[in-house]
């Protein structure tokens, strides 16, 4: 008999039911559980798959460049970035009638097109690309790179090129290479691109391969660098009336510290950005030479960790045993990497709008909204993944003997205190925030809005003031002309920064009031509750009072049979599953807040947010309902407009979201009966009964149905909000 899918599991491939297919798909990437898997092969498979991942990323970005070059309007957009709408790609749809063709023909195109809300036009323009030829060249280069990575992935699975286990376990070498090579040298290379290509282009000087070696990025060349007079590179920066892309008002400085924004593009000064990347490069290249490898000099991470013992002895053995625990657990490493990446992704969301790096992106409101929302959702999924792999570490990789009385063991010993504190914080935040909102709702309903409880966020306003925001009247640090911080930065970056932070047309340190205070605490409630769920799941993953032997059951189990009927819903997987709902819920509040605050800022009616955000009906009526009107009118009996695709996506998103509940609020027996009825009918229907299946159809397991339900809930939720966000923003601002 031919071996059936899945080839990696003898047991599953012999399963006579459809469970074989579902469980095969579910465990395809759980390499550890595959037949004949050794630790070395596990590392090699994961290593090779990284090349595949990189190939896919480069293929995707190559496709972005190619389609814009082929079907976009990059050159026309570059002539007038504020008024031409950037085209992502053409739409070919045989269903389009004449009204649809007309509605979607925009941005100077000859047929229906999609508008780009990703910010790639602004990015490419800022880094010095100007023509379609530039885009094609970039696409071709990335395509070649993609092929190269596929070959490298294949190569590293060949016997002669497979790295051994000791190579993967060599943490110091990997850290040195990643710090110096990945971060350091690539930052240096990027500085080089900015200085040699992007900055000259922003000043109207076209540098390409033909004149790269002859065009001086700075009039004095390398002279100041070699003679140690580095400050020369900061002199004569672009003036405040510089027209981006032209020599009008341009300077010659290449590494500056001006602070604030370029007045015309509303983005950070390109010369400040180059300086930043150079500094990062220097720091990381040095950092990548700190760890001990073949030469017997430098730090040993293991020695550093072993030395980290808290003084006084009351806090246990600190970091003893951590090196081997982390170095031998891929789940621990992945958990750490995902936690760091999740935080960074959320920081990217926060910084992309408040300190825009790309020319003219701040005036493209829909793109700003889309990028913020996109990065916050990505951050949410990455963070839940971090907690999931942390829990898997405790179940599969944690060794109590190796970690006696160190920080990990003490976390587990203190789990009651940790979980109960998180629970208390969530309850406190939830009841108080909801109490304030509901009180304010009732006061408005009774016609006495002056009786609302409105709390000024004085601490947050004070923090904004320390950074130089003068509005609140706090005389402190950067908002006080007498402070040493103020005088120290006066000749450098401070004037530009103060100008930016006190300018009401950008998003830097937005003015905050009672509505912000409330929604801030609502978000804090969401964050603490979301955190408490997977933290409890991970800390209880090895065992709890209710189920001391839980780790024997693995990461995901539905229940432990009728004998212990109270053991349903307590696997670490269930904690992950529940936390994703709360994560989506929290990010919903975050993005609602960001979007509404910005819509009123961009429309010049901030009073609407200030007055309506202090009670729930304000959010429902003046944000959600008011802004979904264009969406619901995407098409109606009188025809359609260019928002109709978002209207359809809005409806479709709701449908997918609702289907999620079909899997979430429904039990296995019902499905098993239904499937058997359908199979019976199928086998007795002429023509249909010519198609038979080898596997006996069985319903999804409880855990699988939850996964399918969760996937539909998440996808539907995101589709619905994406359509709302893009339609409501682009409908207002074009």
Curated annotation (Swiss-Prot):
Locations listed in the record: Plastid, Chloroplast thylakoid membrane
Annotated positions binding phylloquinone: 671
Assigned keywords, A-Z: 4Fe-4S, Chlorophyll, Chloroplast, Chromophore, Electron transport, Iron, Iron-sulfur, Magnesium, Membrane, Metal-binding, Oxidoreductase, Photosynthesis, Photosystem I, Plastid, Thylakoid, Transmembrane, Transmembrane helix, Transport
Binding site for [4Fe-4S] cluster: 559, 568
One Pfam family named in its UniProt record: PsaA_PsaB
Topology in the lipid bilayer: Multi-pass membrane protein
Assembly and interaction partners: The PsaA/B heterodimer binds the P700 chlorophyll special pair and subsequent electron acceptors. PSI consists of a core antenna complex that captures photons, and an electron transfer chain that converts photonic excitation into a charge separation. The eukaryotic PSI reaction center is composed of at least 11 subunits.
Protein name: Photosystem I P700 chlorophyll a apoprotein A2
